[in-house]
């Protein structure tokens, strides 16, 4: 962002990047395996428009796709961001906000960023720094337990055998766990230190265990939008790590991923898929966020290029040989949609069209004139590959005034085969199931 852009943003939080129609329509060409990549837009003033966080009115809820029923599985949480379902059916919710990162909020730009995040529903309160356990003791009755507390902006969770792992913003910790535990009281063991520091621009650290239980995969976001803090600040970032559970040692599994968040296994191919947030301030329609099957050792462009070999000439220290090898992603998810949550579905408690593919939680845009995201979509798969356009699963997070009643983040499939969605503005976990097959009453 330029100084001029920063100075104009607070007046209305909707700075127009160019003299173009404010209500331009953006179509499905932003999604799929072959998105239309328009020329980037350069302007003195950056586009900033974010839906003001409002929360749900009494009785309010998002709209499920035809053939589904939406219920509140749990309410009155504190900024629920991420979900994990234990083998016994207990649901874990990471309640988390950004950690202190003083060097990511200096100057006018930092102050504006804080204002934008506050408007979006983030940063208004200190991080809960805990994981809450939700146990459905009987249909319509959900117990709430503080499973872990005193954490540091936790996001990722994984269970391997009798060991429970948590990805804080600065480290992966482990705790002993036994089936049925509602609280973990043992002191943690630090497995691996993660990149953090005083910038820690993309602070969330996602976590996924390998099917054989030997490794953990961690999504580590960049320390900037497009390398403006210098490449030294990006050491070991913008990557998915592979951690050896026995030793805690890590290696870079894939790199050039600006902000890799959601991680999921595709069972037919055995591929590791990731949802990635791409860079900002190149225009309303580029580059798209995406999901892709990661190649071991693959480089995906950031910060030098996007979507293969599309050069970002704002990055002055280019690396042509690395760009030449940049892997183009598999499936575009729309520009600036903030596609975060990712979960494979083979659920039996959903309509048949949602039973083979990936659910994606789209937190919603701040960097385009027409709001995008703010919904949960489903991408169908055939033979291990995405096919066809996405299907809206959960919408209605924006009201008629474009205020955010909620914002979806993490997604997971529960032990009944229904979809769970963490809503960090509504402070709710929503449950989406096949109409006529729901087994619980609405949480109050």
Each language-model region and where it sits:
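Beta-propeller domain segments
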Residues: 18-64, 102-104, 110-121, 126, ...
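Short coil/turn segments that connect the beta-strands within blades of beta-propeller domains
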Residues: 88-89, 161-162, 212-214, 270, ...
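Surface loop/turn motifs at the tips and blade-to-blade linkers of beta-strand repeat domains
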Residues: 74-77, 146-151, 191-199, 252-256, ...
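Residue position within the beta-strands of beta-propeller blades
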Residues: 92-94, 166-167, 217-219, 274-276, ...
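Asp-box/WD-like beta-propeller blade repeats and closely related beta-sheet repeat scaffolds
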Residues: 142-162, 168-210
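Beta-propeller domains
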Residues: 88-139, 180
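Short loop/turn segments immediately following the C-termini of beta-strands
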Residues: 96-98, 169-171, 177, 221-223, ...
């Amino acid at each position: 962002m330029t100084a001029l852009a920063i100075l104009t943003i607070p007046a209305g939080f909707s700075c127009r990047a160019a003299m173009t129609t404010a209500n331009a329509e953006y179509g499905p060409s932003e999604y799929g395996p072959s998105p239309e990549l328009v020329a980037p837009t350069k302007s003195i003033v950056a586009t900033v428009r974010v839906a003001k966080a409002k929360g749900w009115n009494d009785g309010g809820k998002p709209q499920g796709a035809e053939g589904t029923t939406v219920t509140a599985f749990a309410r009155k949480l504190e900024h629920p961001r991420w979900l994990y379902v234990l083998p016994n059916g207990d649901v874990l919710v990471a309640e988390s906000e950004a950690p202190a990162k003083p060097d990511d909020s200096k100057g006018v730009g930092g102050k504006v960023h804080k204002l934008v995040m506050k408007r979006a529903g983030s940063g208004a309160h200190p991080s809960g720094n805990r994981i809450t356990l939700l146990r459905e003791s009987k249909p319509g009755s959900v117990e709430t337990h503080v499973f872990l507390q005193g954490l540091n902006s936790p996001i990722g969770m994984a269970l391997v055998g009798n060991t429970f792992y948590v990805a804080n913003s600065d480290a992966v910790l482990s705790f002993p766990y036994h089936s049925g535990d509602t609280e973990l009281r043992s002191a943690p063991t630090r497995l691996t230190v993660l990149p953090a520091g005083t910038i820690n621009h993309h602070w969330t650290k996602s976590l996924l265990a390998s099917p054989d239980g030997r490794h953990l995969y961690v999504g580590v976001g960049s320390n900037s939008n497009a390398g403006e803090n210098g490449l030294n600040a990006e050491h070991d970032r913008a990557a998915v790590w592979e951690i050896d559970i026995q030793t805690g040692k890590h290696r870079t599994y894939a790199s050039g991923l600006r902000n890799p968040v959601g991680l999921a296994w595709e069972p037919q191919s055995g591929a590791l898929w990731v949802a990635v947030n791409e860079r900002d301030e190149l225009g309303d329609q580029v580059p798209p966020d995406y999901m892709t099957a990661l190649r071991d050792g693959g480089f995906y462009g950031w910060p030098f290029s996007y979507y293969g070999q599309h050069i970002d000439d704002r990055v002055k220290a280019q690396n042509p040989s690395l760009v030449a090898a940049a892997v183009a992603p598999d499936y575009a998810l729309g520009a600036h949609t903030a596609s975060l949550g990712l979960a494979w579905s083979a659920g039996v408690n959903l309509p048949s069209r949602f039973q083979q593919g990936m659910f994606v939680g789209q937190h919603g845009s701040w960097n385009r004139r027409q709001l995008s995201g703010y919904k949960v979509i489903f991408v169908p798969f055939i033979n291990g590959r995405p096919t066809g356009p996405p299907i809206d699963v959960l919408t209605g997070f924006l009201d008629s005034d474009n205020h955010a009643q909620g914002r979806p983040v993490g997604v997971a499939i529960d032990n009944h085969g229904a979809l769970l969605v963490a809503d960090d503005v509504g402070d709710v976990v929503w449950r989406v199931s096949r109409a006529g097959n729901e087994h619980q009453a609405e949480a109050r």
